[in-house]
Amino acid sequence: MPRPGNPKRRVAAAVADVGSSVFSPLADRIAAHPGPIYPLHVGDTWLEPFEGGRMEDLTVAEHPGMHRYCETGGIPPLVDALVEKLRTRNRIPVERDQVLVTAGATGGLACAVSALADPGEEVLILAPFWPLIRGIVRAQRGRPVEVPFFDRVESPEAAVEAVEAHTSERTVALYVSTPSNPTGRVIPQAWLEALAGWARRRDLWILSDEVYEDYVYRGQHVSLATLAPERTVSVFSFSKAYGMAGNRVGYLAGPPDLVAQAHKVGVHTAYHGPTAGQWAALAALRDGGPWLERVRGAYRAAGEDAARVLGQPPPEGSCFLFLDVRPVLQGRNLLEFLEECLEEGVVVAPGSSCGEAYADWVRLCYTSAPPESVAEAVRRLARRLEPPRAGA
């Protein structure tokens, strides 16, 4: 009996278009670099979580079942604490059925996009943006539409004009990140009010990415759900707030019908966020305040120091600076510049990962290594950013 030939193999086009890590082109070079690496490309912290909220602090005796399955929407004490936090700190009037604990904010956004966008429908994304959101929309079979924004818009009216110019009959949602990854900007309330009013007139969803809400140094963070609660899905994370990225715990809040649909998606992908991580998150909400206050000051100082050396405005929030490097490229492509930085051990993220209009920009995170390491990396980067001398 003849054996069948090799079947034709294919992968879904939507997933093939997602792309791999934005750092893939340099991965081998990074691994082979003989000296110290300054990892300014990763949005993370050098700090451990506060004592009492680390995995080593959790015991089975205190938390029976911490290594087992839990409620798919989140352990009840954490959900209760999140309801209280959202009501008091964010001023979002939620009930328990409007809160869903997820496998990180990344998992929460994936669930939300899957719940609100059908295949081929469009999600507007204010650019430059967090690198993963574009791939999340594509992976859920949606179409990301990039709206150059943070370096182009200077008023609430212009903000509305920018999103309106990119809207079509297939548009279903607008993604907004504030405080912004990668720009470090905090969107003013007047701008958010204008965008919320526009979304209401257009009958669109709003995806409000607020994972850096606890790191605001100038201005004031406003949750979009206070302006348009009936159409806003707000997403938060313990990764950034309390240095718990490895725990993979985030949460979303929104209208109960949308949250119910997002919950179904979550059950059939990750099932639920890690149980032990949720107990650590609860400890952070209860006892992590002093740690958060101390870290906020350290982050602010690191950001201001980096901005001063690089000749940039001080960040308003988050833990990033976004730099236009066109003046020093001199006809080269960005990959060559990144390789030159790597010669000094400095790794920064390519701006194209944050939007097609930003291929000649770079993002750096000033909290991904201890302050003395970041300071040295920034000094090395600053040398690479010096304009070429005439005749050189």
Where are these regions (language model features)?
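Helix C-cap/helix->beta junction micro-motif
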Residues: 33, 140, 201-202, 344
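PLP-dependent enzyme catalytic core of the Aspartate aminotransferase-like
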Residues: 84, 88, 164, 331-333, ...
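Conserved core segment of the aminotransferase class I/II
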Residues: 4-5, 230-300, 385
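N-terminal small-domain helix-loop-helix segment of the aminotransferase-like
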Residues: 3-6, 16-104, 111, 284-287, ...
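Conserved core of the PLP fold type I
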Residues: 66-197, 214-215, 219-228, 233, ...
